[in-house]
Amino acid sequence: MAWKTEVNEVSDDIIDGLWSDDPPLQLESVTKIRRITSQRDISCVIRSGVVPRLVQLLKNQVFPKLQYEVAWALTNIAVDNPGVVVNNNAVPVLIQLIASPKDYVREQAIWTLSNVAGHSIHYRDFVLNSGVLMPLLRLLYKDTTLRIATWALRNLCRGKPHPAFDQVKPALPALEILLHSHDEDVLKNACMALCHLSEGSEDGIQSVIEAGFVPKLVQILQLPSPVVLVPALLTIGAMTAGNHQQTQCVINSGALPIISNMLTRNHENKIKKCACWVISNITAGTKEQIQSVIDANLIPILVNLAQDTDFYMKKEAVWAISNMALNGSHDQIKYMAEQSCIKQLCDILVYSDERTTILKCLDGLENMLKAGEAEKNSEDVNPYCLLIEDAEGLEKISKLQMNKNDDIYEKAYKILVTNWFEEDDENNNNNVRCDDVDFQV
């Protein structure tokens, strides 16, 4: 039967045992404390005032079993109360235990430190500034603690504002080795650590690129495991959010054909959303990069995904399309129109609460209409106006004049006046919406 605490306070016998000079009695009392914290009765442990004594016992190098039980109790306390661990000066002692000769002590110490660092950027920076990184990195070459050490490294890299890049940059060589692991948990956490390192700045992205990670990350995209694919895509997406040269590095590594293949397979939508996000970052780039997306035959795939019943899947696909509409050449926009991209941009306009997405699509449609001026037929008709009308886009844009958001109204108004209606300066005021709608009162 599992041991359960039936008291709401730490007994005097337990406290007396902690302060005893008898190591077996100390161990017995610490084990009881650990069991109480495992039952989530952590507040009574904190109230009892035993944490300073636990930290003292943590220093007992001749009794690793005692150190292990203390570290376990502190691990549980650190989940919701990292300040208790920090304020009782446990972090420096835990960092020393990373070098313990006992695997189980090392692992439990890392777990506690990771819980502290993962709680907030304040505690993350405190643990980093306490000198945890180099001792931790040495453990990344030991199979016995590899999983938890990689998880701890991920926690040390996460959070916004990001840690100072120079402070975590020494982790790059170890992460390069970790990306060759066959352990899914190790790969997942290594990718997420790289993702966090790449999110902070273009300098961070450049360091990751120069360390040679991109080809390996692209190779990981071919693995079947969803556990690994999402972190790998997030990392590549963070890199494509950098400058054009950094985005080009991802393209040159052969990512697009693999992503194209990924989007046509029976992957869960979470993976496909991440893949579309990567594409949208690329289509926000140069015309040459947009052409790379076209050459990878991704436009028909995006059009298909934009019709998905999952709104967030639809949204990510449309975002990639709208970036292309904004940044593409006339020929590329013409190709998009031929692939029914205009309809997908129009269809998303009914989601009236999606301010950012609607504005993005309106910007894309506006730019396509500008490009359509060069494609006018003999009757001086913009062909993209006709395609928008066929997609019921004119009606949807008109209704957006009633949107409560002024930015959406103004953009819709501008598109309508420029492409469909002539503004009569004598009879219309710029503040009057050009599509009169009768409301039932």
Swiss-Prot record:
Start-end of each ARM repeat: 39-79, 80-118, 121-158, 160-199, 202-241, 244-284, 287-326, 330-370
InterPro entries: ARM-like (IPR011989), ARM-type_fold (IPR016024), Arm_3 (IPR032413), Armadillo (IPR000225), HEAT_type_2 (IPR021133), Importin_alpha (IPR024931)
Gene3D superfamilies: Leucine-rich Repeat Variant
UniProt keyword terms in alphabetical order: Nucleus, Protein transport, Repeat, Transport
Entries under SUPFAM superfamilies matching the protein: ARM repeat
Principal location listed in the UniProt entry: nucleus
UniProt GO molecular function: nuclear import signal receptor activity
Record's subcellular location: Nucleus envelope
Any one GO biological process: pollen sperm cell differentiation
Gene Ontology CC terms, in alphabetical order: cytoplasm; nuclear envelope
Keyword Nucleus: yes
Role, per record: Binds to conventional NLS motifs and mediates nuclear protein import across the nuclear envelope.
Annotated family: Belongs to the importin alpha family.
Family matches, as PANTHER family: IMPORTIN ALPHA (PTHR23316)
Subunit architecture: Forms a complex with importin subunit beta-1.
Name of the featured protein: Importin subunit alpha-8
Organism encoding this protein: Arabidopsis thaliana (Mouse-ear cress)
Gene: IMPA8
